[in-house]
């Protein structure tokens, strides 16, 4: 029960989500600067896996947390950007 209290008080899941989003954004910048699609493919699983952490944080704190919401928004932004970059670079039609 102590671990649950620590996770709840310190927004652990929200900060994990935000940290993953920041790392994904840095990798996204690297992919754009170097013009290599491979980096985009590497970052996508991290951004997709971090979204549930932010959602869990929102449910734990009942929507009163900044890191959880920020993590969800940033990771969804990363996922949309990655799909756009990959679809443009590889001439795939993802609907963008």
Swiss-Prot record:
How is the protein disposed in the membrane?
Multi-pass membrane protein
Q: Which UniProt keywords apply?
A: Cell membrane, Membrane, Repressor, Transcription, Transcription regulation, Transmembrane, Transmembrane helix
Q: What induces it?
A: Cotranscribed with sigma-M and yhdL. YhdK and YhdL negatively regulate sigma-M.
Identify the GO cellular component terms for this protein.
plasma membrane
> Which portions of this protein are annotated as coiled-coil regions?
none
**Location of this chain's protein in the cell:** Cell membrane
Q: Which domain of life is it from?
A: Bacteria
Indicate the transmembrane segments per the record. 12-34, 38-60, 67-86
* Pfam family name, one: Sigma_M_inh
Q: What InterPro entries does the database record attribute to this sequence?
A: YhdK
Q: How does it assemble?
A: Interacts specifically with YhdL, while the N-terminus of YhdL interacts with sigma-M.
Q: What is this protein called?
A: Probable anti-sigma-M factor YhdK
Organism (species):
Bacillus subtilis (strain 168)
Which gene name does the record give? Answer: yhdK
